[in-house]
Amino acid sequence: MTRKLTRRHVLAAAAATTTASFVTVARGAPAEAQKITPELIEAAKKEGKASWYTSVDLPVAEKVAKAFEAAYPGISMKVERSGAERIFQRIGQEYQSKIYVCDVVNSSDAAHLIIWKRANMLASFLPEDVAQHFPKEHWDPDGMYASWRLTLSPIAYNTSLVKAEDAPKGFNDLLDPKWVGKIVKAHPGYSGTIMTATQQLARDLGWGYFEKLAKQKIMQVQSAADPPKKLALGERAVMADGGEYVITELKARGEPVEEVYAVEGTPLITGPSAVMARAANPNAARLFYAWSMTAAAQQMNVDVGGMRSAHPMVKERPDRKKLSEVKTLREDAAAVADQADDIKAHYTKLFKV
């Protein structure tokens, strides 16, 4: 049986296996912005492939990969999609076994990038678009990672089952007895989005909120992409959390779903990406990573994937509230990095799953 790795295990394993071959930057020296050059493109095409581990919903990930392949013929992208917490486990296990499959990684749990950076598992590469346009809170000064996507974890409801005037307006409304047996919810042990959201809600509302929610006979699912889909199918009337981008795309297709931005504030989740220090295809990895941060690629994330972007040149979708109009909860990736194992344990104790 494969041993389940905690974040502390990853750091310990990295400390035991780190060598001088890791790509690192001296702390305190800002990384230099890197352009997409003809030389990088040529080197990437010689490698001909790259492996991308991501927690974004598979249909979205495949669209992104195909767009990159169309932009750079001759380079194929292999998409490995799973929940962020599962990706974290997989990379940790591969790392322990000295198997380096992942070239580029994306996680909906920003704390993972902090931990991988601490463990010297990331390569320094700062795309020009990130350095020139992204707010500084959305990229690491050492060039180890940057926010590839932003999303929210709102409440939502099925409009065929719930009238707008009866829908919950905030998280505390979900504790009303009328919602017993009617709520679907994702799991922080699988989803990075939900891990981040759980940390924010536990901090701001207290664990007492989750203790009461656990008594509502919720449908427990894994991925943050699952609650919106269960909602659209009518399997539950309300979702307590989940990926906003999935709700956005379902709604655009005419499914009976509607998001609710909670009066208490809606969890904001950044999804950083990075190039792995041990990437088997380092040039293709850097090219894909740099391309994914361009205004055009970021706009595609929004238009086709329903995500949000930190790139100021990207236009918001007209079919939902602008991010600036949504009251959001404060994200604290460093706190998640330190608290995640305890959060999982506490959540499992409350929800018995």
For the regions a protein language model found, what residue spans apply to each?
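Short, polar/charged alpha-helical segment
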Residues: K35-G74, I155
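N-terminal secretory signal peptides and thylakoid transit peptides that target proteins
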Residues: M1-T17
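Extracellular/periplasmic bilobal clamshell ligand-binding domains
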Residues: E316-V353
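A ligand-binding cleft/hinge motif common to bilobed small-molecule-binding domains
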Residues: A111-I115, A237-P256
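A bilobed periplasmic-binding-protein/Venus flytrap-type ligand-binding module shared by bacterial periplasmic
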Residues: A156-L161, T198-Q199, I269-N281, M300-N301
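Periplasmic-binding protein-like
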Residues: L150-L152, W179-G189, E211-A214, Q220-V221, R253-A277, S292-E316
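Extracytoplasmic ligand-binding site segments that recognize negatively charged/polar headgroups
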Residues: Y53-A65, M77-Y95, Y100-P228, A232-E235
